[in-house]
């Protein structure tokens, strides 16, 4: 596609905030794809570095690029959703501003979607790279999301060890009509990208190509490096011993939660139940799916309990003035989604 007025087959959404360090490599990889019938939608979340200049430079050179700069920082998830709102293609893919893909990534994913109309999406195996683009290791954790059974897909996704699962499925090529079946597409809470994958996977199989064509960049500016537990659950001493739950904090995703007592594990479990409830299934599939979630609930008991214990401590400290003073988490970057939650 060479005309911005023409309707592309595929839309790529690239949310970015202060991404000057790696965005050239990301854009070069996207524009070098052997599949060229796409538009590249860049949503800049009020970057203060050279991101805008770089993006406008590329947009002048390639008419497939559509650059939008938000009037204010929307936060991470709304900026991802803003990319999708601008999409015109029948297929959609998100791209982080610091990752890259091999030249054949789009072509191979689109070919699989064309071959099997039942698929919700298609992705490839993942290789971790460093800041210089050098290979670190290949991701080992894979899921059975291409099963024709919705219950099997739910079971596989539900019981994977998410500490070792970097959610590479988020960067798949998706059918746009599948992603339009719920709103908001990506919520403003910890691990919301996993709920996107869950919902899309409930609507149809997600094909994994057994080639390492997606390169996930590890570097010091990624959100996952923010591991200060005292800031994740402000006002709590217990987090030193019992853990803090999903990272980064709820406030990082939703500034309106600043200073409030939150229950991230309860929210995550609720989103699982809501996803199954909202997805059309046969009665027996729905019954079996809720059975899977009942087992998940039992598995979640320690984490749900931790939420309650930390909330009780925070409430007690507020009433009595006892405990550490809350410290604010860093401002939301609104850029690449997390790989560790």
Annotate each PLM feature.
Residues 28-37:
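Short, acidic, metal-binding catalytic loop of nucleotide-sugar glycosyltransferases
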Residues 104-138:
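Conserved donor NDP-sugar-binding/catalytic core segment of glycosyltransferases
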Residues 70-87, 100:
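Glycine-rich, basic loop-to-helix element that forms the pyrophosphate-binding segment
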Residues 1-29:
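N-proximal low-complexity "stem/linker" segments adjacent to membrane-targeting elements
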Residues 92:
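Short aromatic/hydrophobic "clamp" motif used to bind/position activated sugar donors
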Residues 44-53, 72, 96:
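A conserved acidic beta->alpha catalytic loop
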Residues 12, 85, 102, 124, ...:
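Conserved nucleotide-sugar donor-binding catalytic segment
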Residues 24, 49-57, 104:
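Acidic helix N-cap motif at the loop->helix transition within catalytic regions
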């Amino acid at each position: 596609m060479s005309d911005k007025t023409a309707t592309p087959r595929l839309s790529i959404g690239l949310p970015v905030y202060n991404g000057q360090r790696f965005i050239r490599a990301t854009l070069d990889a996207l524009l070098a794809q052997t599949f060229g019938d796409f538009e590249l939608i860049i949503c800049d979340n009020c970057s203060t570095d050279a991101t805008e200049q770089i993006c406008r430079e590329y947009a002048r050179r390639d008419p497939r690029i559509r650059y939008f700069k938000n009037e204010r920082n929307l936060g991470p998830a709304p900026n991802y959703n803003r990319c999708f709102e601008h999409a015109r293609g029948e297929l959609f893919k998100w791209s982080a501003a610091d990752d890259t893909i091999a030249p054949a990534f789009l072509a191979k994913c689109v070919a699989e979607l064309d071959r099997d109309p039942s698929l919700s999406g298609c992705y490839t195996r993942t290789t971790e790279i460093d800041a210089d683009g050098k290979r670190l290791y290949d991701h080992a954790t894979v899921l059975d999301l291409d099963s024709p059974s919705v219950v099997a897909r739910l079971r596989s996704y539900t019981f994977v060890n998410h500490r070792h699962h970097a959610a590479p499925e988020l960067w798949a090529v998706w059918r746009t009509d599948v992603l339009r079946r719920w709103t908001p597409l990506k919520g403003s809470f910890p691990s919301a990208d996993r709920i996107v994958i869950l919902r899309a996977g409930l609507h149809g199989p997600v094909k994994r190509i057994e080639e390492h064509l997606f390169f996930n960049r590890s570097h010091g500016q990624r959100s996952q490096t923010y591991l200060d537990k005292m800031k994740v659950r402000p006002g709590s001493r217990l987090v030193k011993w019992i853990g803090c739950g999903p990272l980064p904090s709820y406030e990082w995703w939703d500034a309106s939660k600043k200073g409030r007592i939150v229950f991230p594990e309860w929210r995550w479990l609720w989103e699982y139940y809501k996803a199954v409830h909202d997805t059309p299934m046969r009665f027996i599939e729905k019954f079996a799916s809720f059975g899977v979630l009942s087992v998940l609930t039992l598995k979640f008991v320690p984490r749900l309990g931790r939420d309650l214990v930390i909330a009780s401590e925070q409430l007690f400290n507020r009433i009595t003035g006892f405990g550490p003073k809350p410290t604010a988490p860093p401002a939301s970057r609104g850029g690449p989604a997390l790989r560790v939650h």
